[in-house]
A protein has these predicted regions:
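Universal eukaryotic N-terminal targeting presequences
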Residues: 1, 669-670
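Metal/cofactor-centered catalytic core regions of large enzymes
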Residues: 2-612
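Structural preference for solvent-exposed beta-strand-turn elements
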Residues: 622-630, 634-644, 648-660, 664-668
Length: 670
């Protein structure tokens, strides 16, 4: 829904021609994201942007007191899209806390699962969600002049993807009717199958654990995976040149379009896909094994690689508030004062964070979002890093570091070479992603396409290494461990849309503090306490408008393209709290009406009547259709047997367990 409100002289902006335009919720993403803007239509520019989220999630609250071994099962439920990334990161965290190193084969299987997740998620988002922003129908409604030019523009790589003109590419992206749109849906099915082969279930893995995996590794398993992978590799040989043609055309058709979604190059990548020959998950060695990841960790500031050291990256994490619905934790307990290497840990580090929710009415000039504001301290400033939607930061950091060289992939210092082998219908192909001039909307989307090919190439390497282990008889996939009474752990990886870290403190064998920090808090963060805007806000405000529609018919396509280029996933935005049991000892989210609070300490009709007798009316018990005899209506369907929930009262029922006593509809044991 979009609302437009002409602003009067009392707006305080100094410009009476500004128009407020709001998109809440944003469609074709995951979760509850609202974008509130002020637009100057005379100068075709977005003047101000606020990014909001209206639902609180607080896994950090109800993780307290849990068995640490349950952490990956719980945190995978943070998201229904990339839950496996959370499960993986949680297992990394537990591996460090328990001091366990998984067998090599187990880690190769994890890598194969994560690579399949990258292929699946990037494909379905790029082609079936983001692609709609560039399809023929959308362009005809927002930029008919651009579509007319596309009809007469030959696609430079027609021989590779089969589409003669740019307009043909746009038509192929039309939802449900477009040829490429439908093909991508079929491909996404195969990639999910690849994931399930390795980790049992998508998106919440059933065979992934600290210490390794429960997957039984066989030659047949790897063959089933590789059969699907090679079809995906062939698909990539069509997809990469097709998107290059499409995105290059927008630069040509709309001079100045590089300014859309442009922000200062502040990119964070925590690295992903471990090399088990080097990774032991010990904090003291994290710098070394972090640099051996198949996606290199790194912070890129103004195009320069600041660090690839995971220890430095970890110590630089700061969680800011400012415009968020939380109270500060200044003065509360410090869980970790020094890391295992003796380095001081800041109070605003996730290890020391306390989550103190404070619900209130949205005020765009003060508090307006449930998202916190993660920042990275470089020694001078708390930088509002973004992930470039995930792939842009991953490729940029990996390219600059120049550490990856496995044949299928090579980082050169200024680019990443992706070497795809011969497939059924096409010969070997080499793609090269070059560091772009800008960190903007189109380059985030372009990088997403290239990273799909990157993940496929990496998976080929992982499959080969896994087969080496199996053929050598090293088929162990899991290592035993013990949970310590006291301990800390941190895990770093890349969720599909960017940086992901989990931070855990164990006391008395239970979780004392747990904070997951996924990519969307970084990207969707509101303005922090230092007045620094979050990446969505920063990328949108100040950008030009190229849409041809007038104010009354304005769709905001350029704004939507910018926001979606980050691959928003709002379930990941911050650490959902149901209420806690009264004796649990944990704080629950305050509710305007405590008696309607989800997960109240007491449940059921009797409890409801006790709490609010003036509002409670007993309800007749409902019968489930087709479930046994129905009084006054004759027997149920043939062969159907009576089913009834047993209650504690049955044990003292003189009529026998098969003959239920009539109970009042409001009885406590109903």
């Amino acid at each position: 829904m979009t609302s437009t409100i002409p602003m009067g002289s009392g707006s305080g902006t100094g410009n009476n021609n500004l128009v407020e335009m709001n998109w809440d919720p944003i469609t074709r993403i995951v979760g509850s994201l609202g974008i509130y803007t002020k637009i100057d239509f005379e100068n075709n520019q977005v003047v101000e942007c606020k990014s909001t989220s209206s639902i609180f999630r607080g896994y950090s609250l109800f993780m307290k007191g849990k068995d640490p071994r349950d952490a990956h099962f719980i945190t995978s439920r943070i998201c229904g899209i990339c839950g496996d990334n959370h499960a993986t990161c949680s297992c990394y965290t537990q591996n460090m806390a328990y001091g366990v190193k998984p067998p090599n084969l187990g880690e190769w299987i994890v890598n194969l699962g994560e690579a399949a997740e990258y292929m699946f998620d990037h494909n379905i988002f790029q082609e079936n969600l983001v692609g709609v922003d560039y399809c023929e129908k959308m362009v005809s409604e927002t930029n008919p002049g651009v579509l007319a030019k596309a009809e007469n523009t030959r696609a430079p790589h027609e021989a590779d993807h089969g589409y003669r003109t740019i307009a043909d590419i746009m038509r192929s992206l039309n939802p449900f009717t477009g040829e490429f749109y439908r093909e991508a849906l079929q491909v996404s099915r195969a990639t999910r199958e690849m994931f399930c082969l390795m980790e049992g279930r998508h998106v919440h893995p059933s065979t992934l654990y600290p210490g390794g995996v429960g997957t039984v590794a066989t030659i047949q398993l790897m063959t089933d995976y590789l059969t699907r992978l090679m079809r995906y590799v062939e698909f990539m040989k069509k997809v990469v040149p097709m998107h290059d043609d499409l995105f290059d055309f927008f630069y040509e058709a709309l001079p100045g379009y590089e300014q859309v979604g442009l922000r200062r190059t502040l990119l964070g990548c925590w690295g992903s896909l471990q090399d088990p020959d080097y990774c032991n998950f010990e904090y003291k060695d994290m710098t070394e094994w972090g640099r051996k990841m198949f996606v290199t960790p790194g912070v890129v500031v103004d195009g320069k690689l600041v660090t690839t050291d995971l220890v430095r990256i970890n110590l630089g994490l700061r969680i800011m508030l400012g415009s968020s619905y939380y109270e500060d934790w200044e003065g509360q307990e410090m869980f970790v004062t020094h890391d295992p290497l003796g380095n001081p840990v800041d109070r605003r580090h996730p290890w020391n964070q306390h989550t103190n929710p404070r619900p209130q009415k949205r005020d765009l000039s003060d508090k307006y979002s449930w998202v916190m504001s993660p920042r990275w301290f470089d020694g001078q400033d708390n930088l509002a890093l973004d992930t470039g939607g995930g792939p842009l930061a991953r490729l940029w950091a990996t390219a600059l570091a120049g550490l990856v060289d496995i044949g299928y992939l090579k980082a050169t210092g200024s680019s990443v070479q992706i070497n795809l082998p011969k497939t059924a219908l096409k010969g070997p192909v080499t793609f090269e992603w070059n560091i772009p001039q800008w960190s903007n909307t189109l380059e985030r989307n372009r990088a997403r396409t290239y990273f799909q090919a990157y993940a496929a190439a990496a998976a080929l390497h992982f499959a080969e290494k896994a087969l080496e282990e199996i053929r050598a008889g090293r088929t162990k996939t899991w290592e035993t461990f013990e949970v310590p009474d006291e301990g800390i752990g941190c895990g770093f990886t890349e969720a599909v849309r960017g940086v992901l870290s989990h931070h855990m403190v164990i006391r008395d064998g239970k979780i004392a503090n747990y904070h997951p920090y996924p990519p969307t808090p970084w990207n969707a963060s509101p303005t922090d306490s230092n007045g620094v805007a979050g990446p969505y806000e920063d990328a949108v405000q100040g950008q030009p408008i190229f849409e041809e529609n007038d104010r009354e018919h304005f769709k905001g396509i350029d704004i939507m393209r910018t926001v979606r280029s980050f691959d928003p996933c709002l379930p990941l935005r911050c650490p959902h709290v149901p209420g806690q049991r009264a004796d649990a000892g944990h704080a629950a989210l305050p509710h305007p009406d405590p008696d309607r609070r989800v997960g109240h300490a007491r449940r059921g009709p009797a409890a409801a009547a006790e709490r609010r007798p003036d509002r409670y009316t007993p309800r007749r018990p409902r019968r489930r259709r087709g479930r046994g005899p129905r009084p006054g209506r004759g027997p149920g369907p043939p062969g159907d047997r009576p089913l009834r929930r047993r209650t504690p009262a049955d044990h003292g029922n003189p009529a026998g367990p098969g003959k239920a006593r009539r109970r009042h509809a409001g009885s406590a044991d109903r």
